[in-house]
Each structure stands twice: as C-alpha cells, then as structure tokens.
Amino acid sequence: MRRAMTDNDHHLHSLALAAFEQLHTAMLGVVDMFTHESQVTTALLGVLAQRTPITTLVGNFDITSERASLTAALDGYETHRRHARVALWRVMLAEGCSIGEISRIFGLSRQLVSRQLRDIP
C-alpha cells in the first residue's frame, strides 16, 4: 500500500521540479552555445581547407570572450545538473530509499552521495 504524500514530500517534489526546470534551461543554453561554436568551427574549417592565412582572422576574433561564454554555459549546466540530481535523491530518501540504494542506482559511492546531500542546499 502506498503511503499518502506529506507536506514535506510535496515540498521535496516541488524543489526537484524547480531544479530540473533550471537544469533544462541550462541545457538549452548549452545547446545554443554549441550551435554557435559549431558555426564558428565550420567557418574556421572552411578557411583551413583553403589554406589561407588564418593568423589575421584568428587575431581579430575575441577568443577570450568565446572561451568565457562557453565556460560559463558549461559551468551553469554542471551546477544545475548536480542540484537536480541531489533534489531527486532527497525525494528518493523521503520515499524510503537508502543512501546505499541511491549510490547503486547512480553508480556512485555512498560517501559521494552522502557528501553531496550534506553540502548542496
């Protein structure tokens, strides 16, 4: 027999839903970033295929800004992915799942699961 959801269960589910919505938004940002990076790489491949000098082209390109944007997008994705995973674990714990079972399901050590549950708000 399934137990009724408590207020805490509803709260944990709401937190997990919000975390996965943020993860989804971050994923879309990474998709946009990789689409842009792919376009830049395609253009660079065309220049390289023609064996034309690329020093001036690359010198006029703001590589630092591109790298910073890519790093920020990937960092945001990774942060939201970690938060979503921990929110899901909290729901699983509330449903009676043990840390050992969570670690087996996700292929992680119990120590890592415990530490992330403790350290990630």
PLM-predicted stretches and their roles:
Residues 1-62:
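General nucleic-acid-binding
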Residues 58, 62-65, 81, 94:
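Generic, well-ordered alpha-helical segments
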Residues 64-78:
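Short, Lys/Arg-enriched N-terminal segment that forms or immediately precedes the first helix
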Residues 81-97:
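Short, amphipathic alpha-helical "recognition" segments used to contact nucleic acids or chromatin
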Residues 98-108, 113:
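Short alpha-helical "recognition helix" segments of helix-turn-helix
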Residues 106, 117-121:
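DNA major-groove recognition helix of helix-turn-helix
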